[in-house]
């Protein structure tokens, strides 16, 4: 369902007339002022429980040691992207990973996917055609490279997937599901993971390389997949998904 929507948008965005296949859609929910959710860390358990449905890459449950950290209550906004762009964000090497900077230069990237700046406003192409976005609406269609650079610019970082899942089972519960949220974690098997036999085992196991994990679900994600343990994954230059970022930062160990 979600991939059908994003594939249609990707195809229509390449069309010279940029058609819409449905009427205008409502903007993403306004988020309000940002605050920090502080978590003590410690030894936590992540992964899907044994009962109930989950994909094989969500198993097995295992323990992870987390240092104290904080997550933002909201996703990064178009207003914050404005500040990044105004500061020369797409042309400042110090904010970019080496591969990310090479990607920006090779593809002349100066805005999120499907987005363009028209004077003082942002326009983004989506299922309903092009519409104006801005303010505290969450930024969408970001690559991992962009998400990482924007987080650095804002004096923060991306969360690990373990940090994200631990928070989603606590104070972050009910605060996600608008955009897939990039994490800093490489897509890899959990300790003790064994791919199933035959074609079923190939679905996830063979993709566990050169990809980054996203968490949280988006406005187009089926409700059954919006769960704390669900692991989405894409290469770092992917921008056709409804992907954004949530800031994280370290806290002092007391």
What does each model-identified segment do?
Residues 11, 58-88, 116-171:
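Short aromatic-cysteine micro-motif
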Residues 49, 54-59, 95, 102-129:
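Active-site-adjacent "lid"/gating segments
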Residues 18-22, 58-62, 78, 86-109, ...:
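Surface-exposed recognition segments
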Residues 41-43, 48-50, 68-70, 75, ...:
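Short, flexible loop/turn elements at secondary-structure junctions
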């Amino acid at each position: 369902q979600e991939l059908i929507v994003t594939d249609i948008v990707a195809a229509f965005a390449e069309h010279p007339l940029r058609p819409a296949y449905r009427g205008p859609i409502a903007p993403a929910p306004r988020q309000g002022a940002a605050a920090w959710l502080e978590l003590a860390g410690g030894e936590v358990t992540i992964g899907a429980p044994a009962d109930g449905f989950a994909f094989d890459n969500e198993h097995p449950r295992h323990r992870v040691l987390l240092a104290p950290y904080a997550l933002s209550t909201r996703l990064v906004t178009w207003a914050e992207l404005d500040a990044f762009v105004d500061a020369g964000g797409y042309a400042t090497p110090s904010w970019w990973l080496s591969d990310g900077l090479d990607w920006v230069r090779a593809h002349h990237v100066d805005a999120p996917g499907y987005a363009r700046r028209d004077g003082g406003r942002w326009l983004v192409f989506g299922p309903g055609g092009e519409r104006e976005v801005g303010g505290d609406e969450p930024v969408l269609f970001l690559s991992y490279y962009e998400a990482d650079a924007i987080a650095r610019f804002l004096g923060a970082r991306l969360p690990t997937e373990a940090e994200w899942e631990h928070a989603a089972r606590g104070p972050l519960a009910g605060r996600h599901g608008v955009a897939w949220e990039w994490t800093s974690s490489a897509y890899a098997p959990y300790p003790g993971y064994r791919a199933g036999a035959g074609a079923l085992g190939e679905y996830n196991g063979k993709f566990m390389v050169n990809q980054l994990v996203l968490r949280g679900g988006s406005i187009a994600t089926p409700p059954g997949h919006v769960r704390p343990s669900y692991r989405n994954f894409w290469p770092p230059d992917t921008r056709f998904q409804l992907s954004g970022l949530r800031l994280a930062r370290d806290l002092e160990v007391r």
